[in-house]
Amino acid sequence: MRVRFTIYNEEVENTVNDRLKKKLLCFERALSTLEGYEGWMIGTTTLHLDWQPKQGENEFCHTKLTPEIIKKGRSAIRVRIAAAEEEKEWENEEMEVLLVKPRQSVLVPEKEKMPLMKTITELGSEDDDTLAFSRSQMEEYLREAADTNPIHQGEAAVLPGFLVMNACLLRLWKKGWMKGQTALEVRFLAPLRPDEEVYLSDSGQEGRNAVYLRTKQEGKEILSITEK
C-alpha cells in the first residue's frame, strides 16, 4: 500500500481521532432512525468531512442530523444526512447513503445471548494494515450506533458496514492519506463476518487514488475508498 506518511502531534491526533469517531457515530445514529428499511444493505456511501476540530466543538452530536430520502425506487433509496438548513453555516459536513433491498427477505431473529469470543484488535498492529473484528466488538458498536438492523443479529450476522468503514478511515488518516476537508466515496462490495481478517491495499492502478479492503484468505474485495 502506497501512502503519504506524515508525523502528527500526538495530542492533535487523539483529538482528530476522537472527533472522527463521534462524527461518524452521529451520522450512523441518524440513519438508524429511518423507519421501514430494516434489513436493507449499504451499497455506497459518500462522505464530506472536515478532519480538523472546530473551535468550541465539545458536545457529542451538537447539531441535529436528519435523514432525508432524496431518491426512491422499488429496490434502492438514496438518503442524505445533514444538519438543518439554519445550522449549515456551522455544520457543513454530510453523508449520502445508497440503501439496497436484499433479494431475499431478512427475518428478525429471536433475541439470544451472544457468546463472548476472543477479542481481536480492531485496527491491527502498527506494522501492517490488517484489521479484524470480534463479535463482542460488533455488539459494542451496535449499542453505540443504536443499530437494530436484523442482518447484524444472530449466528449468521454480518458485520455492520460502517463499523468496518470507520476503522479503515481512522487507519488511513493516521497514515496521512487524508487531511483537511475531504470528499470520499465508499463502495461496499461484499459482506464481512466477525473474526475474518482483512487488509488494506491500494488499487494497483497508476493515477487512481483508491484503497481497497480485501480478505486475507481469498483476496475478496470487501469495500473500496476513493477520494473524490
Q: Which residues does each PLM region occupy?
A:
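Acidic/His-leaning functional-site neighborhoods
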Residues: 135-212
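Homeobox/homeodomain signature
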Residues: 37-39, 89, 123, 131, ...
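A short linear-motif detector with a strong N-terminal bias
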Residues: 24-29, 40-44, 57-60, 74, ...
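HotDog/MaoC-like acyl-thioester-processing domains
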Residues: 40-125, 192-194, 199-228
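Intrinsically disordered, low-complexity boundary segments flanking structured domains
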Residues: 28-36, 117-119, 169-174
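Arginine residue identity/basic-tract feature
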Residues: 2-4, 19, 23, 29, ...
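Hydrophobic, proline/glycine-rich low-complexity stretches
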Residues: 1-60, 152
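Catalytic strand-loop segment that frames the active site of acyl-thioester-processing enzymes
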Residues: 1-23, 98-159, 173
